[in-house]
Amino acid sequence: MPLPNHHPLQRPLGCRYQFPDPMAADPDGEGLIALGGDLAADTLVCAYCQGMFPWFNEGEPIAWWSPDPRCIIYPSDFCASKTLKRRIKNAGWTFSLNLAFAEVIAACADTRAYAQASTSATWISPAMIEAYTALHAEQVAYSVEIWDDDELIGGLYGLKLGQAFFGESMFHRVTDASKAAFFVLMQLCAHSQFAWVDCQLPNPHLLRLGASILPRAEFLAGLAQQLSLPSIDWSSICGQKLPLNQLLNEDLMTYYLSPTALQLRKLR
């Protein structure tokens, strides 16, 4: 079913639906913008580029949201707590990027299912997993993993478009492991010059990590600017486990993302 096309924005190349302008379609700021469509890769990219994301329970129509206000976090201002830094320094954990995307999104889905056991509902349905896995294959969706030896103990996933990152979900199996994954993401985005990371909806956990609230209009204006900037290549750091405590030295993330690091990987 085509999405409503009232107050249309310019349609990005390859998008099969015309999404409505969130500001015009939802002047009261309730957040719900449209129903219907599909979860094809081009549809998802078009939605995110226009400040919307899918959020619905399995068996319900696909619902597209653009909440007002919007929850974001500034990577350049993020400061890990002393407790988290101590945990990162002493735990002996490693981190990776895009080494176990399927396992991360499945773990996030399980976490949501357990949290909502009374309703047996989770918004990370099999259809959503399939859709974001397809985006991962297109190098749009990324995962951050935290490891204790060979055990995956925490992680998160989201989308990278231009110089914008859209966080989707995180999980932990060991205390502080999801915070460690968030720390890695903040380091990545800060050293990639991302102005902010979209966290979608505020919650106490994100606010404790330093998230802020933006009016939707301000978020959409900033998003347009971030999407216009060239995407930073993260391939030099993908697919390998690296010592997490090394990121306490901020210069190392700059090195990991450098052309020199990428060239050394190609020579291995």
Regions found by a protein language model. Name each.
Residues 1-268:
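N-acyltransferase acceptor-side catalytic subdomain
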